[in-house]
UniProtKB/Swiss-Prot annotation:
Role according to the record: Involved in iron-sulfur cluster biogenesis. Binds a 4Fe-4S cluster, can transfer this cluster to apoproteins, and thereby intervenes in the maturation of Fe/S proteins. Could also act as a scaffold/chaperone for damaged Fe/S proteins.
Native organism taxonomy: Bacteria, Pseudomonadati, Pseudomonadota, Gammaproteobacteria, Enterobacterales
Protein name (database record): Fe/S biogenesis protein NfuA
Organism name: Pectobacterium carotovorum subsp. carotovorum (strain PC1)
Cofactor dependency: [4Fe-4S] cluster
InterPro entries the UniProt entry points to: Fe/S_biogenesis_protein_NfuA (IPR017726), FeS_biogenesis (IPR000361), FSCA_dom_sf (IPR034904), HesB-like_dom_sf (IPR035903), NIF_FeS_clus_asmbl_NifU_C (IPR001075)
Family: Belongs to the NfuA family.
Amino acid sequence: MIRITDAAQEHFLKLLAKQEEGTQIRVFVINPGTPNAECGVSYCPPDAVEASDTVLKFEKISAYVDELSAPYLEDAEIDFVTDQLGSQLTLKAPNAKMRKVDDSAPLMERVEYVLQSQINPQLAGHGGRVTLMEITDDGMAILQFGGGCNGCSMVDYTLKEGIEKELLEKFPELKGVRDLTEHQRGEHSYY
């Protein structure tokens, strides 16, 4: 479910040494399965453990996950990274905003999952997003761009060289992608 690197475990171990005996960590998702999902880590003293919690035992620490957050923390990773500028704890949870979809799920759901968990986080850096509108009978994924992608001069490149390549690689049953957005250049456009 969650991978916690050795560096992160060492970091937590130092922090937990200053807490009440028996305290571990809790990993959670607020607003799971929504675009507003946020992940967090907090202390979990012994009296805060719920019967429905999942206990993840690692080499140096244990982590508790509440029942609601668990499916959204699938494939999550916590790391502690140190570089010339300092150090920081990172929590990557690719399924926090959308529950992981099974390989046997309908094509529409699998494509939507990839868009939401892999493509849109990249587009969000430019204030953009893409939505799957439909998959045609001839295998075309019809997409609509929004935010900073609407009217962006790089949208064709993003569509063909980024999104289409990634989707065709993951879903050989697709034949291509098409953009149905009525692009209007404005202050919202990234380029």
